[in-house]
Amino acid sequence: MAEPALLDPTAAFDLRLYPAHLFDHELPLAGGGGGDDDDDLPLDGLEFDLPGDFSVEDFLLRSPERDDSGEGSAAGSGPTASPSSSPTTSASNSAVANGSGGEVKHEESDEGRSGGGDPKWSLKRKQASPGPSSDAAKCRRSGDGDVSPSASASRTAVDSDEGGTVCEEEEDERRAARLMRNRESAQLSRQRKKRYVEELEEKVKSMHSVINDLNSRISFVVAENATLRQQLSGGSVNCPPPGVYPPAPIPGMHFPWMPGYAMRPPGSHVPLVPIPRLKPQQPVPSSKVVKKPESKKTVENKSKSKTKTKKVASVSLLGLLLIMLVFGAFIPGFNHNFGMCGQSDNAMFRNFGQSHARVLSVSSQDKSSLNNSDMIGVDVGKMTGNTDGPGKKHQPAHNSSEILPALLYVPRNGKHVKINGNLIIHSVLASEKAVAHKASKDDSDQSARDHKETSVAIARYLSLPGKDVNRQETSSADGPLPQWFREGMEGPILNSGMCSEVFQFDISTASSNPGGIIPASPVVNSSSVNATEKIPAHSAAYHGKLKNRRVMYNEAIPLTGKTANNTEPFNRTSESSSKLPDSKPASSVVVSVLADPREAGNGDGDPRVSPKPLSKIFVVVLVDGVRYVTYSCTLPFKSSSPHLVN
């Protein structure tokens, strides 16, 4: 440890021992104690030649070489020291060289060397390293004892030139060593940083591998969880029922379907411990638990059976509806719409508007008998005759042809309407009978053909003679009325009387030969003598009234050209008809029923279904196999209640 040096503030200041840049140029420098101008040092001869890399730290660590002699020790202790010795002592003690890392502390002491009480300054050196270099030792004092300021100052003045050169070389070497140390430390720091970065990269790689491993484990566990859930939901027998085994295994325990290394940390050698399978403690709950999958199966089977039953029921219902539709359209049942009890319906046909419609024969009347009452009706299984006539009695017509009820379905009011063709035939037959009576009255066939506007008689039972009719065998007048138009068993009902003749034409006489169209055998013996005896007289008022065509009349509409008592035309007709031979019976056959194309549509769709209701139909009738007559029949409008003809 360097000894502290005392600095006399009253001593003269020597600028040669201190760098000039530390002091202001305008600072006045006083002499020893007198302060005279003579004591001032000349500064003109001094030259301050400093290097470019000069530093204060290097300057503080550098000091001139001092002598270790003990001269002037006593003189330096006194207060009367020479002015030249004070700055020398301060300069020698101001800086102590101790390597490159030392620190310098300035301490102010209140103690005085003499009893004068003047302040004393000292520089204390604190060394960082105990081993000084050999070159630095040359710049320090060689002695260990106290050196007086005057002696050190004199010694420094002698060897100042040699010490300056040695210190410069020493400073250069020290600077080079410091640079080398700095470079080595920088290199070591870079290497440490590089190693640290490499370690961090290795850690990042290891973390990435751990993350990938954990992701693979998570995916494996998720897949196994999904498989177990599927087995539990499907009621698999392989999975144990809940409640029998422990609720959950220990986290360290491995599953049997997973590999051993998948759940163990790397480097461990723990053997795999199998899952213990315990026997059920409670047999009763276990039996109940075992039955759960069976109950699930039964529930699933029941649900499947229910769905199958519903499907079968729906399919069977559709099939039944289809069968009903087929049978209802092509295989009709017995006709009970007209209240016919004794009638034998051996064959029934429906006309759907085809061009090749069936021809139905209608029994004609035998005109040879004059005393039999004529009855136009639907029931042809029985005949009503005059019991007063010789050889006449009520008997069924075994040789007569059976009337086949032609059931016609016409679209009207959004649905199909059933029309009985036999009643149309009887209506046309009544019209033809009136025309025949008119023709026999005029004795001219040409006049009968030219008479186009004839009324249509209502097809119903005519009045029978009260004295000649056996009322027990005839049908009651209050019985069901013949109807040829009905909409679904309800709605408006139309009887005959709404038909009018449109035109007629004859065919060749060859068609009337036995090889042609065969007329039906007579069914009812025609007689008009007593047919109209009980027609009310007030029916003639029909000519004076104009009624709505929708209104049905409760009496027969009288034909055109009748007399006041309404019996002359029938009497004349019966007389003339009695002269006709029996070999040519009269017959009428419905050939076809047509609809107005303007109302039925364009015919692109189904001919049986039309969205428009029909108001008129055309009926083509073959009369006696030689003449075709076309009638226009008006259909009634739909109403809430049926209209009946009384």
Swiss-Prot record:
Q: Which residues are glycosylated?
A: 371, 399, 525, 530, 565, 571
Q: Set out the biological process GO terms recorded for this chain's protein.
A: response to endoplasmic reticulum stress; response to unfolded protein
Induction of the gene: Induced by dithiothreitol- and tunicamycin-induced endoplasmic reticulum (ER) stress response.
**Spans of biased composition, class Acidic residues?**
159-172
The answer on whether this UniProt entry bears the keyword Transcription regulation reads yes
Q: Which residues lie on this side of the membrane: Lumenal?
A: 333-646
This protein is called bZIP transcription factor 39
Native organism: Oryza sativa subsp. japonica (Rice)
What are the leading ranks of the lineage?
A: Eukaryota, Viridiplantae, Streptophyta, Embryophyta, Tracheophyta
